[in-house]
Amino acid sequence: MGLVVAIHQPHYLPYPGFFDKMRRADVFVYLDHVAFTPGWQNRNYIKARTGPARLTVPVTRRSRGGPIREASIAQGADWQRRHESTIRQAYARALHLGMCADLLGLLYHHSWTNLGMLNLACDLHLTRMLGITTPWVLSSSLGEFRQTKTALLAEICRRLGAATYLAGDGCASYLDPEVLEVAGIELRWQGYRPPRYPQLHEGFLDNLSVLDLLMNAGAEAGRILTSGESA
């Protein structure tokens, strides 16, 4: 059985599916050289008492269209204080708030000027918290690429000697399977199903930041992500 590669753009406080894809792969490629566009790269949601609460890292206008790894965080927006305050209020009664203290310190008590570095530190820390050991490769470390879209994915797989590309379900509308087939790369779909687990506040919301899972499930978060079982 050949090497299975998953590829994903950097996200801020990613949802559990990001890490589910990672754990299913032999190698995880962090797609940090592609263009920054506002969205999951610089924002995500947690669950507050009133419902979903969005956390957005402000990014300078001149960063749009440039590589994610070079995107600059807008200074003077006081986003770190606001994010930490929102999180601590939302999870004041969470059983595992203390477990996330180091993560909050990393994100909100360091001076971040670059979104790429912030996301890399955030996502690596979360990976360790979940007990995932899949090795990472930064796409920016693989040399220059002229390809885009599915051709880019195929070229990354080729450079890594991958036999299989593990695709997230969200790319079904734009991924071209024929490009991978011509390149001799098997296409495998992730088939992700959001895990169910006890949450604070009324009702259940899925596809929040994985921070919600960690706050509520603690050390069991990795098991829940892996098995799909409830806490």
Predicted regions and their residues:
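Residues lining hydrophobic/aromatic ligand-binding pockets adjacent to catalytic sites
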Residues: 1-231
